[in-house]
Amino acid sequence: LGEFESSECIWEDVIETLPRGELRDFLSELNESTVKVALKPQYVDHIPKAFKGNVGKLLSSVNERGLYDEMIKKFGLGHLLERNLDQLSGGELQRVAICATLLKKADVYFFDEPSSYLDIYERMRIVRIIQELSESARVIVIEHDLAVLDVIADLTHIVYGKKGAFGIFTPARTTRKAINAYIEGYLVEQNLSLIHI
């Protein structure tokens, strides 16, 4: 917050600048370590390096919500339970990763590119499952597939910047407006062309 001499961010100062609302409440909870986040990572191919064993062992180890059997059925994973993670295709790993995330008990579920590696039928199944979750929990999805984004999200932030340098989140807008702004390559409220970034 402009205090360049200080090497650490003081959360209370950041929170104080925000208007009362959901973001302020969330950051307060995060600051107080009362928020638990479940993350589906972007790079599912790293999962077999981090966890040795089979699909059933992984999923049962994260079954905090007691939904193991229901999720196995929803994701069509029954035939994969005895298979080692390093033997799975990209799409199978993606489904296992999303299932594992949903089995965790969390306040916020974060899905980084949940549609990659999946065919259109699997993408739509994942969309329905994530939408169902969003009725009872906070859900954040990072997605580059505009068709999936159009179906899965109510509100969308466009994020732009330079890798390793800076990133800016636009204010939330309806998904349709966000997609149109992205396709047009121009953000009216920032008077910014996305083409040159």
Predicted regions and their residues:
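ABC-family P-loop ATPase nucleotide-binding domains
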Residues: 8-93, 104
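Hydrophobic anchor residue at the start of the ABC signature
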Residues: 97-98, 126
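Hydrophobic/aromatic position at a conserved helix-loop-beta junction
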Residues: 102-104, 134
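Catalytic Walker B motif of ABC-type/P-loop ATPase nucleotide-binding domains
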Residues: 109-113, 118
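Conserved catalytic loops of ABC-family nucleotide-binding domains
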Residues: 129-141
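Conserved H-loop
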Residues: 132, 145-151
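Conserved beta-strand-loop-alpha-helix hinge in the C-terminal portion
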Residues: 158-193
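Conserved small/polar residues in nucleotide/adenosyl-binding loops
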Residues: 196-197
